[in-house]
């Protein structure tokens, strides 16, 4: 799943670089809630805490009134688009009592219940957009945009006079953080940082995503937040995977890496321990040139793989996907707009 937490964790703990991870899931999820309830943009008050791609809207209010789980669930199920595209998020809301900031597809990557079989994937995913659970959707979209960039970007730059006034400021954190630091204007956002005292019922050394304020004095996180028990339990499972993965990557520890993959909720829902061991070996060999810390181990892995003949994995879970569009097809759907998310 997403490496945000692991990268932020490694940069802070191992690299000793003061690093803050930024994601746009909170803003996107808030707009989705506003749209489902017909609330004007940016008029809902909310607070979120958790881990990246599993952050929870702990409090939702509009005009001073609390938005309940029942209200939100009902509005999402009635909405033509969201009822089709957000089935995992709605199911988690109904069962756990809180709405997740993350998209339907990404949330399903952190849980063991929604991608076990092809039937599951078809039931809980949508092909309306890659973000809603399409198998390999991110790879497809990246390939399409890369192909467009290589062929058409130079032509795009030659267009005369791109007027920046035509574009509205996005909800991405970057420009607001710079504005806050340079002008002192306080900015409230949700940031990925080492937990410490921010969320009281998650480990202090892990990376969390929670509410903070940026000003000319820097970033100040709100401390003492306590997640609902059920939400903390889901987060803790992924935190353990992230901790093992970070230490395995930094130390070149193959065995710990395999245990991290084995512990992953989605992997463990479809793979046996033998399959995980074999899969990680094959992945290490395939990506050898980018993994110098594993070099001494990879040589012995190669020898072991040569000894294994006709290893059979369990029948693969077939997902659902769309075909990669070529450049001509992409032009017909305004690829410039899609590529730059304008």
Predicted features and spans:
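Acidic, His- and aromatic-enriched active-site or binding-groove loops in soluble protein domains
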Residues: 15-37
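Glycine-rich beta-alpha junction loops
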Residues: 2-5, 23-28, 48-55, 195
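Generic structural marker for isolated residues within well-ordered, non-membrane alpha-helices
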Residues: 7-8, 30, 280
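Rossmann-fold NAD(P)-binding glycine/threonine-rich loop
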Residues: 1-14
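Long, compositionally biased stretches enriched for glycine and/or charged residues
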Residues: 34-340
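A glycine- and small-aliphatic-rich helix-loop capping segment at beta-alpha/alpha-beta transitions
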Residues: 12-18, 64-65
